[in-house]
From Swiss-Prot:
Family annotation (Pfam families): Ribosomal_L5, Ribosomal_L5_C
Name listed for the protein in its UniProt record: Large ribosomal subunit protein uL5
Summary of the function given for this chain in its UniProt record: This is one of the proteins that bind and probably mediate the attachment of the 5S RNA into the large ribosomal subunit, where it forms part of the central protuberance. In the 70S ribosome it contacts protein S13 of the 30S subunit (bridge B1b), connecting the 2 subunits; this bridge is implicated in subunit movement. Contacts the P site tRNA; the 5S rRNA and some of its associated proteins might help stabilize positioning of ribosome-bound tRNAs.
Domain of life: Bacteria
Gene Ontology BP annotations: translation
HAMAP family according to UniProt: Ribosomal_uL5_B
Ribosomal protein recorded as keyword: yes
Organism: Geobacter sulfurreducens (strain ATCC 51573 / DSM 12127 / PCA)
UniProt record similarity statement: Belongs to the universal ribosomal protein uL5 family.
GO cellular component: a single term: cytosolic large ribosomal subunit
Keywords from the named record: Ribonucleoprotein, Ribosomal protein, RNA-binding, rRNA-binding, tRNA-binding
Keyword Nucleotidyltransferase: no
Protein's gene: rplE
Amino acid sequence: MARLKELYHKEIVEQLTKDFGYSNVMQVPKIEKIVVNMGLGEAIQNVKILDSAVEELAAIAGQKAVITKAKKSIAGFKLRQGMPIGCMVTLRREKMYEFLDRLINVALPRVRDFKGVSAKGFDGRGNYSLGVKEQLIFPEINYDKIDKIKGLNITIVTSAKTDEESRALLKHLGMPFRH
């Protein structure tokens, strides 16, 4: 079992139940999924850039990435509906906990001048999103094979009803929030 999952079941559930006064174990918020998304606007001119992005995202997440396509045509961006413009991975269960562990303990500390993640990334429904400016912070990425620095968005979807509950859950899991 993943280290964070074990920590969640053994300690965090008990701690959150005490903090928020839940009457039932099923009320305790848990992480449902993590979505890692890489939006590549430059894929409009150069579709080849998507191949390397899919490969990198698969290496980071440990799971095959799907190519996302444009929902609408936007003339200003020379974009047609259905054109490939990015890639994403949805992680659940064991892989989700392993990815979160790597993100918190390995990748985020490698960010230059890292002071913690912003506490403003909550959406009001108990989900948290953060942006990563470069994919090089992940140890799975080979520095020599990088043709272009690409950023990515990471969304952590929780079953929490409020941002306060979600923040407490992530803090117990070790997410380094700025003060």
